[in-house]
Design a protein with these regions (language model features):
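N-terminal Rossmann-like NAD(P)+-binding subdomain of aldehyde/semialdehyde dehydrogenases
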Residues: 1-98, 126, 268
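ALDH superfamily catalytic-core signature
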Residues: 3, 121, 199-327
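Conserved C-terminal structural/oligomerization subdomain of aldehyde/semialdehyde dehydrogenase
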Residues: 24, 310-450
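Glycine/threonine-rich beta-strand-loop-alpha-helix active-site module
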Residues: 78, 84, 149, 523-637
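Rossmann-like NAD(P) dinucleotide-binding subdomain of oxidoreductase/dehydrogenase enzymes
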Residues: 88-229
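Carboxylate- and glycine-rich phosphate/diphosphate-binding segment that chelates Mg2+/Mn2+
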Residues: 260, 268, 605-717
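ATP/NTP phosphate-donor binding region
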Residues: 452-539, 815-816
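Gly/Pro-rich interdomain helix-loop hinge
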Residues: 732-735, 739-826, 843, 867-868, ...
Length: 891
C-alpha cells in the first residue's frame, strides 16, 4: 500500500509496529540469518541501485555509488555479523551483573539525496541487526531509489523469516509527511542523515534522535608530508562520487615551504587552478542567496565551470581556488559537496592549524579534519593537531571521503554512513553510528558485598619489658636517625630516655620533640614537622597516648609530603577505598613506630588520627590506612604508674571502641573476635587495674593488651556515633575523650538497639538492622545473660553492667555533672549535633542518624536521662507537669 498522505502513514506505522513487536522476540540466530540474507541482497543489487540513484538525483558517479552500496552491505555485515544484539549480551559473575539488549522499537530513517541508496541499505541493515523496524522518509529528489533499496532489503529479510512489514517508506515524501513521521507517537528514535535543516527538525521533534552535522573538512599539509601521496589522496577523495560525501575535503591549507610543490602537483594531476575572472565566476556560483547552490552538488568539475561561464577539459578532476580569506565572506571556505577545493597558504605548521580551526568552526565543527605529515616521526604534530581540532574524526594521511566512513584506511574506525559530530555539531553522539546506538541496554545488578579487609601494623610487640627488645628491629633495619615525638610530662619523667638510651648505644642519632599537648593542634603539628624537615629522620617514634601518636602521624605526613594540604587530608569519605582525596604513599623517608603509654586509644594500631584546628577549635578525625604505624610496641611496664582517672577514661574508651566495632556496618568475622575478646578482658581486668594499679601488674597488662586488641577491631570495622559526638564534646567543652565516650555510650546503645530505625545505614553487607541482636550477643559473650533471656532483657543487663562499671570507675552520671554549664551546652547543642552528623565516624554506625536524633541523645545525656525512642525534649519536659496535673485531678 502506497503512503502518500497522513492517514496512509498512520496505517503503515500500525503495520510496522505489529511487525516489530513480533521481531523483538527473535533469537540472535534468527536475526543473524536475516541480517546476512539482507546484506547479500543489497550487495547483489549494488549496480542497478547505483544507476537508479544517479539517474533520479542527477548527482554523483555510478561507479562510485556502486562502491558505496557495496560498502554499506559488505563492510557493515562484516563488521557486525558476530556482534551480540539480542538477549543477554554479557554476564559478569564476579561483579554480579547481566547486560540485556532490547530493541528501541520503530526508527524514523531520514535519507539524503546525496547518498540515497547506500544510506538506506546501511540504516536498514543495522535496524535489522538490532531487532528494530524502520520507516524511511526519503528525499523527494531520490525517493524511488531510496525506497527501492529499502524494498530489496525487506524482501530478502522476509524470505529469511522476518515479519513482512518490518521496513516501510513514504512513497510521496513531503515536509508534512516527514514531520508527521518524526512526531508520530509510535516512533521511538529518529536516525537522521541529511542537511542541517532536516537534522535540526529531527532534534526538535521531541523524540530521541541521532543526527549528523554538516562537514567542512580542512586538510593541513606540512613540510614533512609525502606530497605525492597527499595530493593523490585528496584528488581520489574529492572526486569520489563528485564530492557529495560529507566528510570530503573542502580546503587544503599548505605550509609555505611546500606550497608551490603541492600546487604544482595538483596542477599536473587533474587539478584546475582558477585564475582571475574564472576564480570570481566560480565563487559566484558556489553560493546562491547565502547558501550552497544545489545546482553544483554532485556535478563534475567541467559542468560547474560551464555554470560559471567558462570551459575546462572534461577530464578535469577538481576546480581549485587559491584564496586567502578564512571567513563566511569567502565562498570557497564553505562546504561545497562538489569537486571544488579551496587552497590556502600558511606561514608555518601552527598557522596552518589555526586556519584549519577557523574553517572547522565556520561550518563543519564536529565532523572531520585531516593532516598530512610524517606520522612516524612527527608524533608531536599529530598530537597537537588532534588537540586543536574540534572534530570527531581526525584523519592522518587519509583520503577523507573514504577514511571518514571507517574500516577502509583505519580498521578500528567503525564503518558507517551516518557520522556523528558530537555536541559541537549539535549531535547526540561523536562517533560513527552503528548497531550499539540502536539498542537499549538493561543491566541486571545482583546484590554484591563489598570487599572487606583486615589491616594491621607489620609488627606488634607486646608483653612487659618488650620495649628495648623491640627497638632492636630499628637497629637491625639500619635506621640511623630517630625522631621521638612525645609530650612534656613523659619527657620530663624519663620515658623518652628509655628509647633514646637504647638507640644511642647502637649509634643511632636521636632528636626529641616533646611539645605535644592534649588534643594536639595544627600549629604544634607544623612545628614538629619543621623539626623533622631539619633533622631528617629515617624513623619516627611516637611515644605516649593518643595525642602524641596522633600528632606524630600527621607530622609524618607533612614531613614525607610537605606539599600536602591539611584540608584535603580531613575531607570526609563514604568509602575509604573510593575517597576523592588519596593519601600519598608513606614510608619513603621514614618508618613510623608507635609506643603506647596509655591503655585506651588503640592509636598504635589504627589508621586514624585526631587533630584540632586552633584557628577554629574544630576537631578533625583523619582516616587512611597510610597512617597505620609500621610497628606497634605494647609494653605494659609503661602504664604501671598511670593515674586512676586516665585508667578509667582510657579503659572505657577501649570498651566503646570494641562495642562500636562489633555493631558497625563494616564489622566482619575477623574484627568480631577481637572486639569480643577485648570486651572480655576489659570486663575481667579493668576494675582491678583501676583500683590496684601497679600492685596488680597482670590486670594492668591485660587492660593494656585489650585496648590494643580493641584498636585492631575498630581499625578495620570503624566506629559510630558515640565517637562522633564525643569528638565534638571534647572539642567544645574540653572533656577528655574517654570520659565523653563513657558519658554517651549507654544512650547510644539505646538509640542503636532498634530493629525498625528511622533510617538504616546503607552498606551492602548490612542487609537489615542487626545492632539489637549484636548487643545481645555481647551480653551473652560477657556472661551477663541467663538462659531464656530475651533480646531486650540481655540489652538491659548489658546496660546495667556498663552503668555499674562507670560508677565504679568514678564516671559522672551526666554531661552536666562533668562540669558543663547548662546555658553553654544549650547554646551549642545544635551545632554539636550537626558537626557530629558530619563526623567521619558516623558513616559506619548501624543506624543512620538524623541530626535531630543526635541532638536528643546529647540532651538526654546532658541531663542524665535515658534515651527513649520517639521522645523529644519537649515531651520529656512536659511529662512531669502532666503527671502532676493528673494527680491533682484524681485527688
Amino acid at each position: 500500500m502506497a503512503v502518500t498522505n497522513v492517514a496512509e502513514l498512520n496505517a503503515l506505522v500500525e503495520r510496522v509496529k505489529k511487525a516489530q513487536r513480533e521481531y523483538a522476540s527473535f533469537t540472535q540466530e534468527q536475526v543473524d540469518k536475516i541480517f546476512r540474507a539482507a546484506a547479500l541482497a543489497a550487495a547483489d543489487a549494488r549496480i542497478p541501485l547505483a544507476k537508479m540513484a544517479v539517474a533520479e538525483s542527477g548527482m554523483g558517479i555510478v561507479e562510485d555509488k556502486v562502491i558505496k552500496n557495496h560498502f554499506a552491505s559488505e563492510y557493515i555485515y562484516n563488521a557486525y555479523k558476530d556482534e551480540k544484539t539480542c538477549g543477554v549480551l554479557s554476564e559478569d559473575d564476579t561483579f554480579g551483573t547481566i547486560t540485556i539488549a532490547e530493541p528501541i522499537g520503530i526508527i524514523c530513517g531520514i535519507v539524503p539525496t546525496t547518498n540515497p541508496t547506500s544510506t538506506a541499505i546501511f540504516k536498514s541493515l543495522i535496524s535489522l541487526k538490532t531487532r528494530n523496524a524502520i520507516i524511511f522518509s526519503p528525499h523527494p529528489r531520490a525517493k524511488d531509489a531510496t525506497n527501492k533499496a529499502a524494498d530489496i532489503v525487506l524482501q530478502a529479510a522476509i524470505a529469511a523469516g522476518a515479519p513482512k512489514d518490518l521496513i516501510g517508506w513514504i512513497d510521496q515524501p513531503s515536509v508534512e509527511l516527514s514531520n508527521a513521521l518524526m512526531h508520530h507517537p509510535d516512533i521511538n528514535l529518529i536516525l537522521a542523515t541529511g542537511g542541517p535543516g532536516m537534522v535540526k527538525a529531527a532534534y526538535s521533534s521531541g523524540k530521541p534522535a541521532i543526527g549528523v552535522g554538516a562537514g567542512n573538512t580542512p586538510v593541513v599539509i606540512d613540510e614533512t608530508a609525502d606530497i605525492k601521496r597527499a595530493v593523490a589522496s585528496v584528488l581520489m577523495s574529492k572526486t569520489f562520487d563528485n564530492g557529495v560525501i560529507c566528510a570530503s575535503e573542502q580546503s587544503v591549507v599548505v605550509v609555505d615551504s611546500v606550497y608551490d610543490a603541492v600546487r604544482e602537483r595538483f596542477a599536473t594531476h587533474g587539478g584546475y587552478l582558477l585564475q582571475g575572472k574564472e576564480l570570481k565566476a566560480v565563487q559566484d556560483v558556489i553560493l546562491k542567496n547565502g547558501a550552497l547552490n544545489a545546482a553544483i552538488v554532485g556535478q563534475p568539475a567541467y559542468k560547474i565551470a560551464e555554470l560559471a561561464g567558462f570551459s575546462v577539459p572534461e577530464n578535469t578532476k577538481i576546480l581549485i581556488g587559491a584564496v586567502t580569506v578564512v571567513d563566511e565572506s569567502e565562498p570557497f571556505a564553505h562546504e561545497k559537496l562538489s569537486p571544488t577545493l579551496a587552497m590556502y597558504r600558511a606561514k608555518d605548521f601552527e598557522d596552518a592549524v589555526e586556519k584549519a580551526e577557523k574553517l572547522v568552526a565556520m561550518g563543519g565543527i564536529g565532523h572531520t579534519s585531516c593532516l598530512y605529515t610524517d606520522q612516524d616521526n612527527q608524533p608531536a604534530r599529530v598530537s597537537y593537531f588532534g588537540q586543536k581540532m574540534k572534530t570527531a574524526r581526525i584523519l592522518i594521511n587519509t583520503p577523507a571521503s573514504q577514511g571518514g566512513i571507517g574500516d577502509l584506511y583505519n580498521f578500528k574506525l567503525a564503518p558507517s554512513l551516518t557520522l556523528g559530530c558530537g555536541s559541537w555539531g549539535g549531535n547526540s553522539i561523536s562517533e560513527n553510528v552503528g548497531p550499539k546506538h540502536l539498542i537499549n541496554k538493561k543491566t541486571v545488578a545482583k546484590r554484591a558485598e563489598n570487599m572487606l579487609w583486615h589491616k594491621l601494623p607489620k609488627s606488634i610487640y607486646f608483653r612487659r619489658g618488650s620495649l628495648p627488645i623491640a627497638l632492636d628491629e630499628v637497629i637491625t633495619d639500619g635506621h640511623k636517625r630517630a625522631l621521638i615525638v612525645t609530650d612534656r610530662f613523659l619527657f620530663n619523667n624519663g620515658y623518652a630516655d628509655q628509647i633514646t638510651s637504647v638507640l644511642k648505644a647502637a649509634g643511632v642519632e636521636t632528636e626529641v620533640f616533646f611539645e605535644v599537648e592534649a588534643d594536639p593542634t595544627l600549629s604544634i603539628v607544623r612545628k614538629g614537622a619543621e623539626l623533622a624537615n631539619s633533622f631528617k629522620p629515617d624513623v619516627i617514634i611516637a611515644l605516649g597516648g593518643g595525642s602524641p601518636m596522633d600528632a606524630a602521624k600527621i607530622m609524618w605526613v607533612m614531613y614525607e609530603h610537605p606539599e600536602t594540604h591539611f584540608e584535603e587530608l580531613a575531607l570526609r569519605f563514604m568509602d575509604i577505598r573510593k575517597r576523592i582525596y588519596k593519601f600519598p604513599k608513606m614510608g619513603v623517608k621514614a618508618k613510623m613506630i608507635a609506643v603506647t603509654t596509655t591503655s585506651g586509644t588503640g592509636s598504635e594500631v589504627t589508621p586514624f588520627a585526631v587533630v584540632t584546628d586552633d584557628a577554629t577549635g574544630q576537631k578533625y578525625p583523619l582516616a587512611d590506612y597510610a597512617l597505620t604505624p609500621d610497628m606497634a610496641i605494647v609494653d605494659a611496664n609503661l602504664v604501671m604508674d598511670m593515674p586512676k582517672s586516665l585508667c578509667a577514661f582510657g579503659g572505657l574508651d577501649a570498651v566503646t571502641h570494641a562495642m562500636e566495632a562489633y555493631v558497625s556496618v563494616l564489622a566482619s568475622e575477623f574484627s568480631d573476635g577481637q572486639a569480643l575478646q577485648a570486651l572480655k578482658l576489659l570486663k575481667e581486668y579493668l576494675p582491678a587495674s583501676y583500683h590496684e594499679g601497679s600492685k596488680n601488674p597482670v590486670a594492668r597488662e591485660r587492660v593494656h593488651s585489650a585496648a590494643t586488641i580493641a584498636g585492631i577491631a575498630f581499625a578495620n570495622a570503624f566506629l559510630g556515633v558515640c565517637h562522633s559526638m564525643a569528638h565534638k564534646l571534647g572539642s567544645q567543652f574540653h572533656i577528655p575523650h574517654g570520659l565523653a565516650n563513657a558519658l554517651l555510650i549507654c544512650n547510644v546503645i539505646r538509640y542503636n538497639a532498634n530493629d525498625n530505625p528511622t533510617k538504616q545505614t546503607a552498606f551492602s553487607q548490612y542487609d537489615r538492622p542487626q545492632a539489637r541482636r549484636r548487643y545481645a550477643e555481647i551480653a551473652d559473650h560477657l556472661g551477663l545473660s541467663a538462659p531464656g533471656d530475651r533480646t531486650a532483657a540481655k540489652i538491659e543487663k548489658l546496660l546495667a553492667w556498663l552503668e555499674t562499671l562507670k560508677a565504679e570507675l568514678g564516671i559522672p552520671k551526666s554531661i552536666r555533672e562533668a562540669g558543663v554549664q547548662e546555658a553553654d551546652f544549650l547554646a551549642n547543642v545544635d551545632k554539636l549535633s550537626e558537626d557530629a552528623f558530619d563526623d567521619q565516624c558516623t558513616g559506619a554506625n548501624p543506624r543512620y542518624p538524623l541530626i535531630s536524633e543526635l541532638k536528643q541523645i546529647l540532651l538526654d545525656t546532658y541531663y542524665g536521662r535515658d534515651y527513649v525512642e520517639g521522645e523529644t525534649a519537649a515531651k520529656k519536659e512536659a511529662a512531669p507537669a502532666k503527671a502532676e496535673k493528673k494527680a491533682k485531678k484524681s485527688a
